[in-house]
Amino acid sequence: MIKLLFMGTPQFSATVLKGLLDNPAYEILGVVTQPDRAVGRKKDIKVTPVKQLALEHGISIYQPEKLSGSQELIEIMGLGADGIITAAFGQFLPTLLLDSVSFAINVHASLLPKYRGGAPIHYAIMNGDKEAGVTIMEMIKEMDAGDMVAKASTPILETDNVGTLFEKLAIIGRDLLLDSLPAYLSGELKPIPQDHSQATFSPNISPEQEKLDWTMSNQEVFNHIRGMNPWPVAHTFLEGQRLKIYEAQLAEGEGLPGQVIVKTKKSLVIATGQGALSLIVVQPAGKPKMSIIDFLNGIGRKLEVGDIIGR
């Protein structure tokens, strides 16, 4: 039985971890995940999906704010793991830790060397890519730059958003890891170096990127909305208040960027730099997420054709 240390945080990671837990060839000695966070207006404490899964299986949990130089690092290195598996962990691994095990493998949600970094799925959708994928790679000190063990891809559908694509890639990543790890550990599967000259990056989404730019084409704004759903969520402004936009559909029509060009009891169409978008699901400031019909029956009632949002 191969003894593993698992490191990850979101549901993507938990899906990979569950695959390892269900496989009798591996024993998870401990998991390292991000600290619990206070979320929402009530500041409720939220544990990571990886921690929740570890709790259910009675696995030791480590949650250092920063792994390097921490007491947890010393404890983790004392577990005697054969190797490390990471998936969307969210921190760099200290060289000391990498050197303490026989192997360290990362499950990364992109077709490397494209989209190294923390938000590959967001950028794949926002940039209008036709496919996304997962790369199983060796861990080195440089971010997502290690040799590649295996790759798998899947089409990005017009109906996909970050949430749906995360779910698909998590399953692909889980299966790809379980399929390739035995051959890698036996030496049968030889890693392939990345072409570093082709590397692109996907840094974490900044608050500035969440704001919609209505001067872009309708396809670009549509992709941007999908690439922010369900987190961190794209937004515009209505009378100085933030209006989050979760879903929209491509529409025809012309007008000034951000201008209301169609308003009925059931639809609201906004002009973009080229074409238009029909808003489907929105969330006004201080209100729950709602359909555009409910929005037009409430706060959106005051909107008129010719009004401009986003200012």
Swiss-Prot record:
<dbReference type="InterPro" id="IPR041711">
    <property type="entry name" value="Met-tRNA-FMT_N"/>
</dbReference>
<keyword id="KW-0808">Transferase</keyword>
<comment type="similarity">
    <text>Belongs to the Fmt family.</text>
</comment>
<dbReference type="InterPro" id="IPR044135">
    <property type="entry name" value="Met-tRNA-FMT_C"/>
</dbReference>
<dbReference type="GO" id="GO:0004479">
    <property type="term" value="F:methionyl-tRNA formyltransferase activity"/>
</dbReference>
<dbReference type="InterPro" id="IPR005794">
    <property type="entry name" value="Fmt"/>
</dbReference>
<protein>
    <recommendedName>
        <fullName>Methionyl-tRNA formyltransferase</fullName>
        <ecNumber>2.1.2.9</ecNumber>
    </recommendedName>
</protein>
<dbReference type="InterPro" id="IPR001555">
    <property type="entry name" value="GART_AS"/>
</dbReference>
<keyword id="KW-0648">Protein biosynthesis</keyword>
<dbReference type="InterPro" id="IPR005793">
    <property type="entry name" value="Formyl_trans_C"/>
</dbReference>
<dbReference type="InterPro" id="IPR011034">
    <property type="entry name" value="Formyl_transferase-like_C_sf"/>
</dbReference>
<dbReference type="Pfam" id="PF02911">
    <property type="entry name" value="Formyl_trans_C"/>
</dbReference>
<comment type="function">
    <text>Attaches a formyl group to the free amino group of methionyl-tRNA(fMet). The formyl group appears to play a dual role in the initiator identity of N-formylmethionyl-tRNA by promoting its recognition by IF2 and preventing the misappropriation of this tRNA by the elongation apparatus.</text>
</comment>
<dbReference type="InterPro" id="IPR002376">
    <property type="entry name" value="Formyl_transf_N"/>
</dbReference>
<feature type="binding site">
    <location>
        <begin position="110"/>
        <end position="113"/>
    </location>
    <ligand>
        <name>(6S)-5,6,7,8-tetrahydrofolate</name>
    </ligand>
</feature>
<dbReference type="Pfam" id="PF00551">
    <property type="entry name" value="Formyl_trans_N"/>
</dbReference>
<dbReference type="InterPro" id="IPR036477">
    <property type="entry name" value="Formyl_transf_N_sf"/>
</dbReference>
<dbReference type="InterPro" id="IPR037022">
    <property type="entry name" value="Formyl_trans_C_sf"/>
</dbReference>
<dbReference type="GO" id="GO:0005829">
    <property type="term" value="C:cytosol"/>
</dbReference>
